[in-house]
A protein has these predicted regions:
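Transmembrane signal-anchor hairpin modules in multi-pass inner-membrane enzymes, especially those
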Residues: 1-108, 112, 145, 152, ...
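Juxtamembrane membrane-water interface segments that cap and precede transmembrane helices
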Residues: 50-57, 183-201, 379-398
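Aromatic-anchored transmembrane helix interface
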Residues: 94-102, 116-140, 149-158, 162
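Alpha-helical transmembrane segments of multi-pass inner-membrane proteins
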Residues: 148-182, 198-270, 417
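Transmembrane alpha-helices of multi-pass inner-membrane enzymes
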Residues: 259-260, 437-479
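A membrane-periplasm/extracellular boundary helix in multi-pass inner-membrane enzymes
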Residues: 266-350, 368-372
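Long extracytoplasmic/lumenal interhelical loops at the membrane interface
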Residues: 336-405
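Hydrophobic transmembrane alpha-helices and their immediate junctions
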Residues: 403-446
C-alpha cells in the first residue's frame, strides 16, 4: 500500500498547488510574481546585451545565454499580457509595432516569390524576431522605479564593457602572443580586435553603442543630483576612453550628435542643474585626458593622433603625450614615431580606404533595388551583389531595398510616437528625466545604424523596446 499512498500524496500535493496558483492568478498575485521575475531577467538580459556583443560566448546548439534570458522573460510576462491583453493592444507602441510586423510578413512573401537569397531572408526574419521584446517590456517596465533600476543595470554593463576593452587593449600590447585572445573574441562575436601595430590595437565591441547610452544615463542622473557625483565623472571618462580605442568613425559621430541632443534636453528639463552639468562635463573631459595620457605613457601608443588619422584619412602629428614621453626619455621628440610604427598605421588607414570603396559599391548595388521598387521594396532577402555573405551594413538602404519607404516609415513610427509623447508630456520628464535619457540613447542607435546593422538585430531592437516602454512607465506612476 505504500506506493499507492505515496502516489496519492503526490496527486494531492499537485492538486493543491494548482488550486493555489489558480487562486493567486485570480487575485493577481501570481501575475505580479511572474512580472517581477520577468523584470529581473530583463535586467540580466540588458546587462548581457551591454557587455558581450553578439552574445555567442556560450551556446548549447542554437540556444545562447541571450536567447535563453529573452525567452524566459517573455514567457514570464505572458500572464500580465493575457490578463490585460485588450489594454495593451490599444497601446500605440504595441499596435504600431504589430503593423510593422504585418508589413514584414508581406515583404517576406514578396522575397520568397521573387526568389531572393533565402539565407539573407531568414537572417532578416531572425533579426526582427526580437521585436517580441516590445510588448514584454511595455508590460513589465510599468513604473519609474523599474525604469531607473533597468538603467542602472545598463550603466553598470556599459562600464564593465569599457573596463574589459581597456584590459584587452593592454593585454594585447603587452602579451607575446595575443592571437588566441583576439581569435576567441572574434569567433564568439564579442567584438573585433585588430592589431594595428606593435603599440596600437583597435578594440571594437559590438555592444559599443551601449557605452554611449551609459554616458547619457550618467549625464541625466548627474543633472538631478544635488552635487557633483565623481562616480559618474569617472564612469564617463572610462567610457570615453573605451570609445576612443574603437577607432570607429560612426561611434565618434554618434557620440557627438547624441551628446548635443542630450545636453540640450538636460538644460531644458533640469534648468536648476545647469552649472553642475557643465562642471560635470568639464570634469569628465579632464579625467578622460588624464586617463589617455597615462595610457599613452604606459603603453607607448599615440591613441588620439591615430583616432584623428583614421577619422579624416590623413596622417597627423603624434599627440602631446607621446612627444612629452619622448622628451622625458631623451629621445628625439619629433612629430612622428619610428618608421616601422608609422608604416603599420599607414597600412591600416589604407585598408580603411579600401573598405570605404567596398561600401560605395554596396550602396550603388542597393540603390538598384531601391530604384526598382522604392515604395514597397523588393522583398526580404534582397542583397547587394558584391557581398557574398549578404551582409550589407547600411541599415537604411537595406530597409528601403527590402521593405520600401512604407516599411522604413512603419518601423520608425513607434519612435516618432514616443518623441511626440515626450514633447507633450514634458512635465512627466521633468519628474523622471531618465525617460528622456532612454529616448536620447536610442538616437545613438539611429545614427550608428547607418553604417552597421544594429537596428535590425537584438542590440538595437532591445533598446528600441526599452524606449517604447517609457510612456507606460511614466504614465502608470501618475495613474
Amino acid at each position: 500500500r505504500l506506493p499507492y499512498r505515496t502516489n496519492s500524496l503526490v496527486v494531492n500535493l499537485l492538486q493543491n498547488r494548482i488550486l493555489n496558483i489558480t487562486e493567486e492568478f485570480r487575485r493577481g498575485t501570481f501575475t505580479q510574481r511572474c512580472s517581477q521575475l520577468s523584470f529581473g531577467i530583463l535586467c540580466l538580459f540588458l546587462l548581457e546585451c551591454s557587455i558581450t556583443g553578439g552574445g555567442r560566448y556560450w551556446e548549447a546548439g542554437p540556444v545562447s545565454v541571450r536567447i535563453l534570458l529573452g525567452g524566459l522573460a517573455a514567457v514570464l510576462a505572458l500572464p500580465e499580457l493575457f490578463r490585460h491583453l485588450g489594454a495593451y493592444l490599444k497601446k500605440p507602441a504595441v499596435w504600431l509595432t504589430l503593423a510593422f510586423v504585418a508589413w514584414l510578413a508581406f515583404c517576406a512573401w514578396r522575397g520568397v516569390r521573387a526568389e531572393n537569397r533565402m539565407d539573407v531572408l531568414l537572417t532578416d526574419i531572425k533579426g526582427f524576431m526580437w521585436l517580441f521584446l516590445v510588448p514584454v517590456l511595455v508590460a513589465t517596465v510599468r513604473s519609474r522605479q523599474r525604469l531607473r533600476v533597468l538603467l542602472s543595470w545598463v550603466l553598470a554593463g556599459a562600464v564593465i564593457q569599457a573596463a574589459l576593452i581597456l584590459a584587452v587593449n593592454a593585454a594585447v600590447v603587452l602579451m607575446d602572443d595575443p592571437a588566441p585572445l583576439c581569435r576567441w573574441l572574434n569567433e564568439h562575436t564579442v567584438g573585433i580586435v585588430d592589431v594595428v601595430s606593435a603599440r596600437l590595437v583597435r578594440v571594437f565591441f559590438k555592444s559599443s553603442p551601449y557605452m554611449i547610452v551609459g554616458c547619457v544615463v550618467a549625464l541625466f542622473r548627474q543633472a538631478r543630483a544635488p552635487k557633483l557625483r565623481w562616480r559618474y565623472v569617472l564612469a564617463v571618462a572610462l567610457l570615453f576612453n573605451a570609445l576612443l580605442l574603437s577607432y570607429t568613425r560612426s561611434l565618434y559621430g554618434a557620440l557627438g550628435l547624441t551628446a548635443l541632443v542630450s545636453i540640450v534636453a538636460v538644460l531644458v528639463l533640469c534648468p536648476e542643474g545647469r552649472k553642475r552639468t557643465l562642471a560635470f562635463l568639464l570634469a569628465a573631459v579632464v579625467c578622460f585626458g588624464v586617463l589617455v595620457t597615462v595610457q599613452e605613457f604606459a603603453l607607448e601608443g599615440s591613441y588620439l593622433s591615430f583616432a584623428v588619422s583614421r577619422t579624416i584619412g590623413k596622417e597627423v602629428p603624434t599627440s602631446w603625450a607621446s612627444q612629452l614621453r619622448s622628451q622625458l626619455r631623451g629621445e628625439d621628440p619629433g612629430d612622428s614615431p619610428d618608421d616601422g610604427e608609422m608604416d603599420s598605421q599607414r597600412s591600416y588607414i589604407e585598408v580603411t580606404e579600401k573598405s570605404d570603396q567596398l561600401r560605395q559599391e554596396t550602396k550603388d548595388s542597393l540603390n538598384v533595388y531601391i530604384q526598382r521598387s522604392p515604395i514597397i521594396g523588393c522583398g526580404l532577402g534582397a542583397s547587394a551583389a558584391n557581398r557574398d555573405k549578404g551582409v550589407d551594413e547600411y541599415f537604411y538602404l537595406d530597409m528601403l531595398a527590402r521593405t520600401g519607404v512604407v516599411g522604413l516609415l512603419l518601423y520608425m513610427l513607434p519612435f516618432g510616437y514616443v518623441v511626440v509623447w515626450c514633447l507633450r508630456r514634458r512635465e512627466l520628464l521633468r519628474e523622471c528625466p531618465e525617460g528622456a535619457a532612454v529616448v536620447c540613447g536610442l538616437c545613438t542607435f539611429w545614427i550608428v545604424t547607418w553604417f552597421n546593422p544594429w537596428m535590425n538585430a537584438v542590440l538595437g531592437i532591445a533598446w528600441y523596446a526599452v524606449t517604447l516602454s517609457v510612456p507606460q512607465a511614466l504614465e502608470e506612476q501618475n495613474a
